[in-house]
């Protein structure tokens, strides 16, 4: 295909136009008085959201070069969401400010590589300042405050997240699902999470969140590697007849077996996902036995003379729901017998008491926590499907931000920490004026998140920034909800340090890429329609399956 090539400032200007289009759509959601964005869906009713990354992900531009800029900015928002669970709009606002100011200086003749070095120095200094000023959170009240702010001021969400953490511990497994009624409840169910993700992204059922969600699945636990599905045909046929999904947990699923599962998943004949078993060696076997007890299934092991071809559907475990991400698998509400689970817990406790190895003790305690801790489920209800989905998005954001706060502590919110941190950059020593200009870019950009929060509340951002910079107290800020100047920490307006840090680092990374880019190569726009016909789903034969 022919390529379109642009050099220098001409290309960068077009990239920045794409950055501006995406940033203008996302920035309106920032702060307690941020607005909603309505997004057309390919099917069903439109989505209404105040979540920056959801807005960013929905944007594709027709112009290829502008779209390249939008996609770069989208990557900053997406990365912030993946690492810290929040801060996506802050990352977008910062990245746009850094890229815009940097491009102006490059056009004025400054060296882009030295500008980048100056920006990197400044960002590292601000990150250290954020770490220094962060405060650990311990109380339920502080956890609720973080959840409230991250869910756009919804106190109920903050309180429910704090309650869920109290039930299963700060490191415990908490999931979010839609309720069948108007209420918003916390329920603790039998469940387990382990650190193994899907073996192929083709198993994903929710492409927006990149997770595989299996409702009421069968669970096959196999001790060895699966490289050929031939021995499994009888059990696979039985699962297809039941019209329920299947989760395969094995030492590994590889080659022909994995390819066949993927093909059948894509053709819709078999709702399936496969993950590697957690742990190694003897510990792997023990953990698989734990999962078997939790789900009322059997571990298919050759030690007991069991063979895959002889396995019936009765040997499979079951659970209410399984969610699989790139890195983790969460089994919610396994159908295991309560007494069997309690007996297994007692057995592990006695092993902990008997072992002399610190390492073994630690691993046994991990197993005990997984088996006995349970899973807290936040059940989100509402009057309409649109309302439930919008609220569920906010709950998921708030939960991720609260976890980040527990991990790295909190700082003053509302853009105040970044604003005051910018003033510590005046004393940085650099090699030349171009690097100094890079530092100045960061100093100016760090004002933008606070300005945007204030402007979304209907006030003048520049005036508020000026007033705050006159004040020596680093926690002194502007409460955009009540339109008052307050001590942000005392007022409970706090942000997770990890969210603020990640937003800045991801924004600087993307902005640096833009200002150091000299040539752009994209596909030449084509007037022809796509000549490839759409794929047809399903195949004849055994339930659309192809073994």
From Swiss-Prot:
Composition bias type Gly residues, residue spans: 537-547
Localisation per UniProt entry: Cytoplasm
Superkingdom assignment: Bacteria
Record-listed E.C. numbers: 5.6.1.7
Top-tier EC class: isomerase
Residues reported in the UniProt entry to bind ATP: 29-32, 50, 86-90, 414, 495
Pfam annotation, one family: Cpn60_TCP1
UniProt function note: Together with its co-chaperonin GroES, plays an essential role in assisting protein folding. The GroEL-GroES system forms a nano-cage that allows encapsulation of the non-native substrate proteins and provides a physical environment optimized to promote and accelerate protein folding.
Name recorded for this polypeptide: Chaperonin GroEL
Taxon lineage: Bacteria, Pseudomonadati, Pseudomonadota, Alphaproteobacteria, Rickettsiales
Gene that this sequence comes from: groEL
